[in-house]
Structure formats: structure tokens, C-alpha cells
């Protein structure tokens, strides 16, 4: 019975951890939506080949801050906010706009991770369900443990002197 309870606690912690991971991945997926589907590894390969790509977010009226020597690609827009990829053959460059971090993983990889973790979460939730079906065993073990504890407490409180026993 206690083994079931320990399993249940362990599974509950795993479920909570998986739910948190899925939540974080879903937030990352939402953050990446504006950039569309691309492989961040491709950006790294281009960098190794001497082509630097940086991602920026800016207001439409800030486009004039970008020097003409750079190739500017508008990836998407959300109202007056633009999401840009700026391409250069310079080793490094700085533009007075809000630079966005290149993601570690692309949308496809994030969605695949969400799916895998979702399947794993469902499996753990099924295990919890199966343990709940065995809850009568856990309750029985709990009652037996309480009875045993009561007996041990009574036994520990007993004393004896010669032929007289007392509590």
C-alpha cells in the first residue's frame, strides 16, 4: 500500500514537471511564430560560410535606422511592429534596433518536442489512473499502519513493576 502511495507521489511530480516543460515549449512556439518555419542550424552554417544573419524587431518608422549596405528582409509584421532578418558579409555588425536571439530550435523541432512530451504525459496520467484503481489497497495499508502505530504507542507507554503492569 505504501509502495502505491510512493509511486503516486513520484508520478504526480513527473506529471507536474512534464506539464511545466510543455508550457515552456508552447510559449517558445508562440514566440517563434512570427519568424515562420526555418532551421536555426542553417543560420549557423551560413555564419561559418561568412554570411551573418541577425534577427530584429522594430517599429515601421525605425526602418530608416538600417544602413542601406545591409540586405533587409521583412519576415512578418504585427500591426506597426516589423520582424526583420538582416544579412551581411561583415564579421559582426550593430544596428540600433532591438535584436532578437536566434532560437536554439526551429518550429518543427519545438512542435515535435511538444508532441513527444504530450505522449509521455498521457502515459504518466494513465499510470496514475491505474494506481487510483488500486486506492482500496492504499486505504487498507493506511488503516493497518494506523492500527500498528496505535499498538506501538500503547506498548511504548506501558510499564511494569514486579507483578503490576500500568499505562
Regions found by a protein language model. Give the residues of each.
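Long, charged N-terminal accessory/stalk domains
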Residues: 1-167
Amino acid at each position: 500500500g505504501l509502495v502505491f502511495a510512493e509511486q503516486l507521489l513520484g508520478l504526480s511530480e513527473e506529471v507536474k514537471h512534464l506539464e511545466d516543460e510543455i508550457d515552456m515549449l508552447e510559449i517558445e512556439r508562440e514566440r517563434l511564430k512570427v519568424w515562420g518555419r526555418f532551421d536555426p542550424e542553417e543560420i549557423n552554417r551560413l555564419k561559418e560560410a561568412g554570411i551573418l544573419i541577425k534577427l530584429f524587431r522594430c517599429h515601421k518608422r525605425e526602418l530608416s535606422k538600417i544602413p542601406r549596405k545591409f540586405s533587409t528582409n521583412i519576415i512578418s509584421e504585427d500591426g506597426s511592429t516589423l520582424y526583420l532578418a538582416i544579412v551581411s558579409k561583415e564579421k559582426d555588425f550593430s544596428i540600433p534596433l532591438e535584436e532578437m536571439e536566434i532560437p536554439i530550435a526551429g518550429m518543427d523541432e519545438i512542435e515535435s518536442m511538444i508532441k513527444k512530451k504530450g505522449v509521455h504525459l498521457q502515459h504518466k496520467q494513465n499510470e496514475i489512473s491505474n494506481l487510483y484503481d488500486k486506492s482500496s489497497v492504499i486505504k487498507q495499508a493506511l488503516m493497518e499502519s494506523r492500527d500498528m502505530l496505535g499498538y506501538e504507542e500503547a506498548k511504548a507507554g506501558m510499564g511494569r513493576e514486579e507483578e503490576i503492569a500500568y499505562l
